[in-house]
Amino acid sequence: MENAGGAEGTESGAAACAATDGPTRRAGADSGYAGFWRPWVDAGGKKEEETPNHAAEAMPDGPGMTAASGKLYQFRHPVRLFWPKSKCYDYLYQEAEALLKNFPIQATISFYEDSDSEDEIEDLTCEN
C-alpha cells in the first residue's frame, strides 16, 4: 500500500511539475520569436487595446494622421485593400508592387466588382 501511495505521490508530483513546466515553456517559446513583427503589438512591446474602427480615424484629419506628412502612422488590423476585378490580372503585378512600396503593411487584397470592367464592355460590344 505504501508503494501505491508512493507511486500516486510520484504521479501527482510529475503532474504538478508538468503543469508548472507548460507555461514556462510557452513563455520561452514566445521570447524566441521576438524578432518577428506582429501588428497587434506596438514597437514598445505593449499590446494594442482593442477598440472598434471608427470612420473618423480614416478621415484625413482623424487622430491616426500625422500633421507633417498626412500619412497614417497607425493602422487597425486586419487591413483590407480593395482592388477592382478588372485589374486583377492585367496590371496587378506592376501596380501592386508600386502600392506596396507606398503602403508597406501587412494587408489582404480584396477584389470587388467594378462597373467599368473590361469583360463587361467586351460582352456589350459582342452582343451588338
Curated annotation (Swiss-Prot):
GO terms for biological process: bone morphogenesis; determination of left/right symmetry; embryonic pattern specification; negative regulation of transcription by RNA polymerase II; Notch signaling pathway; ossification; post-anal tail morphogenesis; somite rostral/caudal axis specification. Residues 9-22 have a biased composition (Low complexity). It comes from the Eukaryota. Pfam families: Ripply (PF14998). Residues 1-63 are annotated as: Disordered. Its main location: nucleus. Belongs to the ripply family. Plays a role in somitogenesis. Required for somite segregation and establishment of rostrocaudal polarity in somites. This is Protein ripply2.
